[in-house]
């Protein structure tokens, strides 16, 4: 069975959950400001994927849009050497490592070394109008297709709704 792409190309400027926004400007804070003082903020650039629900985006319910960074495996491994250990990505693929979600590459879904990884542990919140203008400037961009979009959304929900217990029921022997 041939694996189809998880993605479709879109040219419209409207935003939806699962939209991949390349080279998006994000604030980078270097220090905590003192009261009544100015703070210089650096601007970084990151590839991001929208996690805000499409219905909220379409109905204008949000002034801010939630996004997570998305990386190629090589980019992620460069910053996180532990990720290059044997078996790491297989555990992520099986949803055994919290906070990460794998998505197929845009062009060659059969090659899992070209996969993309979403890091749910880092969430940005950027203005809706700003992102709409950024999306319009991209001309073509990628958007997750169903049912991969729903799978992605559910993975984020599972990560976000975790509850850590102080103690657990002991294992059965």
Task: Give names to the regions the model predicted.
Residues 1-14, 32, 36-42, 80-173:
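C-terminal terminal-subdomain/extension
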Residues 10, 24-26:
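A structural micro-motif recognizing beta-strand termini
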Residues 21-24, 50:
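A generic structural signal for residues embedded in beta-strands
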Residues 26-30, 55:
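Short, charged beta-turn/beta-strand-edge "cap" motif at the junction between a beta-strand
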Residues 40-58:
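Short, hydrophobic, well-ordered secondary-structure elements
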Residues 52-93:
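Compact nucleic-acid interaction/catalytic patches
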């Amino acid at each position: 069975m041939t694996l189809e792409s998880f993605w479709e190309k879109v040219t419209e400027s409207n935003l939806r959950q699962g939209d991949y926004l390349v080279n998006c400007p994000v604030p980078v804070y270097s220090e905590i400001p003192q009261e009544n003082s100015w703070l210089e903020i650096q601007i970084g650039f990151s590839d991001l994927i929208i996690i805000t629900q499409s219905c909220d985006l379409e109905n204008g319910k949000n002034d801010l849009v939630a996004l997570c960074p998305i990386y190629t495996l090589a980019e992620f491994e460069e910053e996180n050497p532990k990720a290059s250990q044997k078996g790491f990505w297989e555990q992520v693929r099986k949803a055994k490592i919290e906070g990460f979600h794998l998505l197929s590459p845009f062009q060659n879904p059969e090659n899992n070394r070209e996969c993309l990884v979403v890091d749910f542990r880092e969430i940005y919140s950027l203005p809706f109008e700003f992102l709409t203008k950024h999306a319009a400037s991209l001309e073509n961009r990628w958007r997750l297709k169903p049912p991969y979009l729903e799978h992605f959304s559910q993975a984020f929900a599972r990560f976000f709704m975790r509850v850590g217990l102080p103690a657990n029921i002991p294992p059965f022997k």
